[in-house]
Every structure is written in structure tokens, then in C-alpha cells.
């Protein structure tokens, strides 16, 4: 069974990707008091988390504090485990957003409980995460205007053109 983590005042919370477009591996990363945790995630999990946080921030008071600037992944990028699901909540008393990531268990791992990572972030950290995630999504593969599928670096055989147009 993998380790669980709880960060109540992280100084770093971000998403990042390693590898060329089309082959990138996505990560969520948090650090508190020298403890760095990196979790492997899916691109769509990062996108969904950013969209949800963006919507949540619209319902909360404006971010008054300074947003973190450097949201790069911190080396070494060693994944603790793979994310299966992400949940988000708001702790009104502490004015913190709770992000909970749950571990994906492999079938052969048996009946143990999945690990979790609980991270309490500020509204400024959430706003910075949203901007970082948006930049990550834009840095991916170009989208075909006809079929809305990502284009590979070597070109794209568009199904809407019945495979006849390679662009």
C-alpha cells in the first residue's frame, strides 16, 4: 500500500507535464516543509480540476493575496502513485480549498485501501493553478479544425476528409 499525504499549508501546488506533445505525462505536485509529493495524473484530470477550481473561485471573494509565480515542477519528478479520482471542497472557516486525490489501485494489489493526498490551498494558489493548467493545455498538440482531434507532430489524416487530406 502506498503512503497517504496531508498538507495543511503547502508552499507549492502545481500541475506539470514531462515529454513532447502527444506523449506528455501529467503530474500534480505539492510541497510543504521540505516534503515534496508528485502524483501521476491524466491530462483530463488536470483540465477538470482547473475548470472546477475556476468555477469555485468565481463564487468566492476575489483573490487579494499575491499569486505564486513559479509553478514549474520541482525536480526530481518521482511519482508516489497514480491518481484515480480527485475531489474538491471549501473550508469556509479556514478560507482554504481542499483538494483530495485518491490512488488508483492495480488489481493485483489486492484489498488494501487506496492512499490519498489531502491538500489545503489558498484561493491565490488555486487561481495560479488554473492559469498553469490552462498554459499546459495550450502547450499540447494542435487541434484539427475539421474533426477536433489532436494532430500528431508528423501530420494528421483527418477522418472528416475520409483519410484523403493529410495536413
Positions of PLM-derived features:
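Short helix-loop boundary/capping segments at the starts of domains
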Residues: 51, 55-62
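Intrinsic, low-complexity N-terminal interaction/targeting segments
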Residues: 1-20, 26, 64-120
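Short, surface-exposed beta-strand-loop junctions and turns on beta-sheet-rich folds
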Residues: 33-35, 44-46, 55-56, 104-107, ...
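Short cysteine/histidine-rich metal-coordination sites, predominantly Zn2+-binding motifs
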Residues: 158-167
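Surface-exposed, interaction-prone regions used to assemble/regulate multi-protein complexes
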Residues: 11, 20-27, 37-38, 58, ...
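N-terminal interaction modules that seed assembly of large macromolecular complexes
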Residues: 19-52
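Mixed-charge, glycine-accented linear interaction segment located at domain edges/termini
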Residues: 39, 103-157
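Short, structured motif recognition centered on aromatic/hydrophobic residues
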Residues: 24-29, 49, 53, 97-99, ...
Amino acid at each position: 500500500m502506498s503512503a497517504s499525504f496531508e498538507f495543511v499549508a503547502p508552499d507549492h501546488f502545481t500541475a506539470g507535464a514531462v515529454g513532447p506533445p502527444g506523449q506528455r505525462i501529467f503530474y500534480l505536485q505539492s510541497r510543504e516543509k521540505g516534503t515534496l509529493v508528485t502524483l501521476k495524473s491524466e491530462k483530463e484530470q488536470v483540465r477538470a480540476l482547473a475548470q472546477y477550481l475556476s468555477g469555485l473561485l468565481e463564487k468566492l471573494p476575489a483573490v487579494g493575496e499575491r499569486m505564486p509565480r513559479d509553478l514549474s515542477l520541482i525536480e526530481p519528478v518521482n511519482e508516489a502513485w497514480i491518481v484515480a479520482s480527485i475531489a474538491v471542497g471549501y473550508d469556509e472557516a479556514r478560507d482554504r480549498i481542499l483538494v483530495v486525490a485518491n490512488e488508483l489501485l492495480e488489481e493485483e494489489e489486492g484489498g488494501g485501501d487506496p492512499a490519498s493526498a489531502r491538500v489545503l490551498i489558498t484561493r491565490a494558489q488555486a487561481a495560479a493553478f488554473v492559469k498553469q493548467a490552462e498554459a499546459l493545455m495550450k502547450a499540447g498538440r494542435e487541434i484539427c479544425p475539421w474533426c477536433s482531434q489532436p494532430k500528431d507532430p508528423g501530420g494528421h489524416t483527418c477522418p472528416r476528409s475520409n483519410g484523403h487530406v493529410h495536413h
